[in-house]
Regions:
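Phosphate-binding P-loop
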Residues: 1-4
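P-loop/Walker-type NTP enzyme "switch/lid" segment
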Residues: 6-16, 31-105, 112, 147, ...
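Active-site signature of alpha/beta-hydrolase-fold catalytic machinery across serine-
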Residues: 24, 28, 120
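Conserved catalytic-core segment of NTP-binding enzymes
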Residues: 32, 108-184
Length: 184
């Protein structure tokens, strides 16, 4: 079996719509017949995990045959959020290894903000999907933009982190290895 495609929905800004977009991508892939594994790294909110748990409960209660993703168990999110980075990475790596064996696509939903788990996930991505809204607050995610001329003055911290993930991929897997970055 070929390695699964890894999609990371990422953006350091909270409230940009990452979890909502992740849910729609997963649902579309499931209805296209793909085996999808999800990993929700927003350890405190777990919006994507909760959505699919509620969907499964509703489907079972109503006898509806809805396709569902698999989700490796990372334990209680709030407890894991308080654990040290080494423990968080151990749990994530175990979940990722399990997902690799069970899916055509692994979709990872990341939290707003810079975390060790988010950086690690970005480095594993084949595709990074970044939702943003039409505002200067969101445009600053991509880079500092002159509000009058709309010229890009410098890349943002998040753009630099995506660049670092791409650079790491090229160094570790060869110059033709790439990470696609899709901004929606």
């Amino acid at each position: 079996m070929a390695d699964p495609t890894v999609i990371v929905v990422g953006n350091e800004k909270g409230g940009a719509g990452k979890s909502t977009l992740a849910i729609h991508i997963v649902t579309g892939l499931l209805h296209a017949g793909k085996r999808v594994a999800i990993i929700d790294l927003d350890l405190r909110q777990r919006s994507m995990s909760r959505f699919f748990a509620n969907r499964a409960a509703w489907a079972e209660a109503n006898g509806a045959g809805l396709p569902m993703p698999t989700e490796p168990d990372m334990g209680d999110g709030k407890t894991l959020a308080k654990a040290d980075e080494a423990e968080q990475l151990n749990r994530f790596e175990a979940a990722f290894a399990e997902a690799r064996n069970r899916a055509d696509v692994i979709l990872i939903d990341t939290p707003g903000g810079d975390t060790v788990l988010s950086r690690t996930a970005h480095g594993l991505a084949d595709q990074i999907v970044t939702p943003m809204n039409d505002s200067f607050v969101d445009f600053d995610l991509l880079g500092q933009v002159d509000p009058v001329t709309l010229d890009l003055l410098k890349p943002s911290i998040y753009s630099e982190s995506v660049w670092e993930a791409r650079k790491h991929r090229a160094i570790t897997q060869g110059r033709h290895a790439q990470i696609d970055w899709i901004v929606v």
